[in-house]
Amino acid sequence: MTMEHGEDCCVKVAVHVRPLIGDEKLQGCKDCVSVVSGKPQVQIGSHSFTFDHVYGSSGTPSAAMFEECVAPLVDGLFQGYNATVLAYGQTGSGKTYTMGTACKEGSHIGIIPRAMATLFDKIDKLKNQVEFQLRVSFIEILKEEVRDLLDPATAAVGKLENGNGHATKLSVPGKPPVQIREASNGVITLAGSTEVHVTTQKEMTACLEQGSLSRATGSTNMNNQSSRSHAIFTITLEQMRKADPIMTLDGMPIEEMNEDYLCAKLHLVDLAGSERAKRTGSDGLRFKEGVHINRGLLALGNVISALGDEKKRKEGAHVPYRDSKLTRLLQDSLGGNSKTVMIACISPADINAEETLNTLKYANRARNIQNKPIVNRNPVADEMKRMRQQIEYLQAELVSARGGVVLDDVQGLRERISMLEQKNEDLCRELYDLRNHGYTDPCEPELQKIGTGYTKGEGLKRSLQSTEPFDVPMTDSVRAGSPKDIDDEVAKEWEHTMLQDSMGKELNELNRQLEQKESEMKMYGSDTVALKQHFGKKLLELEEEKRAVQQERDRLLAEVESLNADGQTHKLRDAQLQKLKTLEAQILDLKKKQENQVQLLKEKQKSDEAAKKLQEEIHSIKAQKVQLQHKIKQEAEQFRQWKATREKELLQLRKEGRRNEYERHKLQALNQRQKLVLQRKTEEAAMATKRLKELLEARKSSGRDNSGMNGTSPGSHMTEKSLQKWLEQDLEVMVHVHEVRNEYEKQSQLRAALGEELAILKQEDVMSGAASPPRGKNGNSRANTLSPNARQARIASLESMVTISSNTLVAMASQLSEAEERERAFSGRGRWNQLRSMAEAKSLLQYIFNVAADARCQVREKEMEIKEMKEQMTELVTILRHSESRRRETEKQLKQREQAAVTATTSPGNGNGSVKHSADDSNTPLSPVAVPAQKQLKYSAGIVNSPSKGVPAFNKQHLKMVPMAQLPVGKKVSIAGQSGKLWRWKRSHHQWLLQFKWKWQKPWKLSEMIRHSDETMTRTRPRPQLLPHRPQRVM
């Protein structure tokens, strides 16, 4: 395989920020990674990084990752360029999901399925021009062993369970292991791996699925399906392009040497994630796998650091490819013959801030790696090209020999042929690129327009020929013209004729409408004339009637005048008028009477109506009264119920208020304690981080001084004290790194506890109406003890503390990352470069031995002290338990004595008996007795502090109530001997009863006690002596 040199290009780096997963949300994790809007820039804490692409979070959507990053690599694969897609990141950051390594048939999630689909789509488009061959291989690196995942024997072994419950894999006996080989041209190959020829996407997906099932996976605390190995899925594409044939002198093509071979590989790498044993909870086999994973990733990080350092690259520094099989296989992808895209998968959770920061740092270094991708051609193609040039040279010489052509002309022809071939190749390549990118010829729209115009012209011709009434005779001048002019004239005449026809039709339509309107107008005019004639006739008839009426009036007037002329008629008229007047007078009188009767009836009707109205009002008032009374009762009952409900609610609110106040104080105290703890831990972390930073800066400056000294005087060497000081400083740095690491772990645990409580409270807040709210680790539910306001206050306080803790974690992660990075730079051989002789090494080794011995002795002494303190603590715990049990027993007996005393003193008619029982019970070992003390009783014997007589010595003593068990033995004996006289004296004085009650009862019952004491003294008399035997205990 030969290679054509290309231009250098940098490794492209894309960052994929996955969202928070369910476990992280339950822990209350916050986003510690922010993406600058509109820019491929990521910020975490005080660090800022710029990459080629950023996906997820507030950056570019993840769906665009393939088109922007991987699709160009697939296109380059058809041009003969190798390509690599590398997924790197912490365990559980989404590498396998992003790559799609574990996809199944029909899935389109991930880079690998989409790459396969794009690859076969392009093959389908070019299969008529190029002959393709596809091969795939799938390997994994498990515990520094290369395993073939496509080998049927390996796949048939499957997974077995070992004693620890972990899944492991067995090797196939008799099968040689896969070996890494390097060809003469520097290409890395795998000897013994299986390469499967595929022709369809389904076959390739089946190979991927088979290898994924055989890959080593396991469950950890951070991921249920964690990849335990580095997986590399390789697609090899071979192309055979047909070139232009070479013609012989006889014009016959040479068929045997007209092909071009290209071979390119696409490596899709899914790395196992870096992990910490404390976070993953791995042990046994899982722990060993994690160690090998971290070792391979460390070697990869060293390779990235060596290639990304421009100074080392210019100096030609050694790149440790051979430190790991992973870096050995990725030698071409990192700094070699490949176009490489690195996808850094990160988690935005604050608990993963340190690992996220380290991933971003490695990805940032990877951007500085320079690759040199070149076109990979088959050696057969080179040989064909060489033979083609030789044939052309021989043909030119033969032509020159036969035709006597001058050699200079032959040379010129050769140059011209080379130039034309080069131009032809460029044109072919351009045509190939245009076809691949779906290029469209800009002349095609114009050709379509011309074709459309020509088709339209043909249609016009056919229409003109079919239109016989509009045929126009052609003149001689037209006949004599060219065919093009004739066609134009015919087209114009046909268009004019069609226009005239359309206009004629429009005019006919207008005439028809006009005639219709005129006929309507005529019809309306004839109707108007008929109406006019009708109303004229009516007017004439009315005039005739008017004249007839006037004539009748005149005739009647004449008759009246003729009647007035007759005298007899006049007398009769007078008589009739007189009679008429009399009748009119009677009518008037009757009308007046009628009017009076009507008026009386109206008044009676009014009075009846008033009475009826009053009766109705009375009934209405009575009904309203009954309703009002009923309403008053209802209102009173409702008010009583309302008042009772309100009082009940008020009591509940008061009780709730007291409970809330208690909860508030309790939460305030809890928040204050947690804030103090958080503040203390934060301050300790800040101090440790600050001290670590100072030590690192001091070591860095001392390292520069030492390097400068060594550079100025190569022969000089450090003194013994300088070496010891330097070693002490390095040990101090390691100790502080360990301290910061411990503080980081404590802060993480505190952060997890706060997050868990916050998640539980938020879930309870959402499900506050549920019957059984979720419980925490201690099994207690806060839903029954926290009110909504208290819960919200607690949530706000926890969110504030979680934010502070998250910021602290991010800052500590940044410092730890820097410390580990510097420690990595000083580790290995770099730490001991300052030693110049064996004597210095021996001296330093002796000093290290002394330091280790002293440390071991101090550890042993501390262990002995811890053991002694544990023993003392055990003894003190035992004593404390015994004391606590005695205290509980004492409190129980004291409570029983108090109940017995209260029962005895409050029983009516049994004052003496009560006093006797109480007094006799006081002789028990744990009963109170009167002994001298510095505290005096508030009240002396007697009623209302009356001075006591007859017993001055006893009343003047200072008394104190103490348990009998705390008295010495001699005191107990003396008290036992004097008890008879003492209690006889108490029973002979009834005033002691009041003093006893005042001592043990409630103060506000003093007046009742005094009255009861006076009544008791008047009714009872003291007995002459006490009974000799001890009475039973009053319970």
From Swiss-Prot:
ATP binds at G89, Q90, T91, G92, S93, G94, K95, T96. Its main location: nucleus. May be regulated by cyclin-dependent kinase A. Residues 697-720, 766-787, 882-928, 1014-1035 are annotated as: Disordered. Changing K972A: Loss of nuclear targeting. Residues 704-716, 778-787, 902-926 have a biased composition (Polar residues). Residues 380-437, 498-702, 850-904 form a coiled coil. Residues 10-369 form the Kinesin motor domain. Disruption phenotype: Dwarf plants due to significant reduction in cell number. Dwarf plants due to significant reduction in cell elongation. This phenotype can be rescued by exogenous gibberellic acid (GA3) treatment. Reduced mechanical strength (brittleness) due to an alteration in cellulose microfibril orientation and wall composition. Changing R987A: Reduces nuclear targeting. GO terms for molecular function: ATP binding; microtubule binding; microtubule motor activity; sequence-specific DNA binding. GO terms for biological process: cellulose microfibril organization; microtubule-based movement; mitotic spindle organization; plant-type cell wall biogenesis; positive regulation of DNA-templated transcription; regulation of cell population proliferation; regulation of gibberellic acid mediated signaling pathway; spindle elongation. It is found in: Nucleus; Cytoplasm, Cytoskeleton. It holds the Pfam family Kinesin. A motif (Nuclear localization signal) lies at residues 971-987. Residues 882-898 have a biased composition (Basic and acidic residues). Microtubule-dependent motor protein involved in the control of the oriented deposition of cellulose microfibrils. Involved in wall biogenesis and modification, and contributes to cell-cycle progression and cell division. Acts as a transcriptional activator in gibberellic acid (GA) biosynthesis pathway. Binds specifically to the DNA sequence 5'-ACCAACTTGAA-3' of the ent-kaurene oxidase 2 (CYP701A6 or OsKO2) promoter. May regulate CYP701A6 gene expression and mediates cell elongation by regulating the GA biosynthesis pathway. Homodimer. This is Kinesin-like protein KIN-4A. It comes from Oryza sativa subsp. japonica (Rice).
